[in-house]
């Protein structure tokens, strides 16, 4: 989504430019959802920056608020009419278990803000429209306790949408650790990220982790993440955890009935290639 630098935001004392950017982001979202409908895209992650610097003002203060609200309502109608499953994945700075009170405050605000957008779209407050985050910190009993404590400070409908994803660092939260320490305490479903699991399997095969994560969704269809290594696909050196522009393979769903969010830099081009490869694999 469109945004503006902090210095520019501070100069926008009447929120006119900020409001215009939010309106453009809302209209762009409607266009994208219509494109998805025309091209049979059924799973889509909505960008997190519809409202730039939203922690610094009340959204209802924006000069274009009523028009923005109409576009969000229209977006929700398109989503339901076309059967799209949409999600949010707020930024990495969201850390409910942080020891810094300001980080926790901003994290709670950010999650409730994303949830409010879903509410504005009139989408049910369920895991069908998930709000996906990481614990985002190294595993410890103290971090687990803080995360669960702050979870209870979220708005009720935010809690009804929140899901947690396995991390890609060996000392962080694997699927197994999320199951034993987060899901077992607060019932939050686990988003299985195939790529992250390759860096932090915690003794589970990919199939075992996928089944363990799927179990936590109960009556809801699990939404998993799939991506591939930029180093391998594009023959470059660098961070092995960096995502490739395209997914050249197709995931193994291990017989599970799941939805998949494709995490690739090339967006709709990557999706088109992935679907073509998936179709070719099915008919071969």
Provide a role label for each language-model segment.
Residues 50-52, 92-94, 135-140, 169:
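Short, internal active-site loops enriched in acidic
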Residues 1-85, 94-108, 112-123, 127, ...:
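Alpha/beta catalytic barrel-like cores
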Residues 188-191, 199:
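Long, compositionally biased, intrinsically disordered segments
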Residues 142-147, 206:
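A general structural motif
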Residues 170, 195-201:
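Short acidic, Gly/Ser-rich segments with clustered Asp/Glu that frequently serve as metal-coordination loops
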Residues 89, 193, 260:
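Conserved, mostly hydrophobic/aromatic
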Residues 129-143, 234-240:
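Glycine-rich phosphate-binding "P-loop"
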Residues 90, 133-135, 164-166, 262:
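Short glycine-centered, acidic/aromatic-flanked micro-motifs in structured strand/loop junctions
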